[in-house]
Amino acid sequence: RGVQEATGDFILVQDADLEYDPADYLPMLEELGRAERRSVYGSRPLGIIRDCGWRWPFPGRHADQGLGPWVMNIVLVSLFLLLFRRWITDSLTAYKIYPTALIKSFSVKTCGFETDHELTCKLLKAGISIVEVPIAYEPRSLEEGKKIRPLDGLIALWTIVRFRFVD
């Protein structure tokens, strides 16, 4: 419903769980002003590499992040690279800036976490550049209310394949 109500030039998405630092929107907005026909995503893996360095064997993995979500993100990165020839390091980020008119023009068919992937696929198919900016990230545990589950990873894979070839 938020997309329908949006009136500005851009839609800014922010997760409400405070895993992210709102100050990270400033570099995202700065990046947005550099060129047209783009969307900006905050990248948690790039932020972790920026803040902690390239830690072998799990680069881009937060010390408090489970191995499963990190591995699934590597699979998603690989799938975007294979299907779209684009390196998207964090399609599930909850820090995104979209062009309002373009997002309103899409017929969104999903709900839930898979909408992130549907919109990313549609942006790439429309020729919109997705620029990623490193952001800070403090992951929550299941006990603290983390919502994403292993099934969501499988749904994400299907969603990316589906929207690469359909709609």
Question: Which residues are covered by each model-predicted region?
Answer:
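A short, conserved beta-strand element in the Rossmann-like catalytic core
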Residues: 17-21
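Acceptor/aglycone-binding surface of glycosyltransferases and processive sugar-polymer synthases
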Residues: 1-5, 10, 22-113, 140-148
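Terminal low-complexity segments of carbohydrate-biosynthetic enzymes
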Residues: 23, 155-167
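Catalytic donor-sugar/metal-binding loop of nucleotide-sugar-dependent glycosyltransferases
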Residues: 86-87, 108-111, 120-138
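DNA-recognition element of transcription regulators
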Residues: 117
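Non-catalytic, C-terminal membrane-associated alpha-helical segments of glycosyltransferases
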Residues: 146, 150-158
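Generic recognition of well-ordered alpha-helical segments
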Residues: 31, 78, 122, 156-160
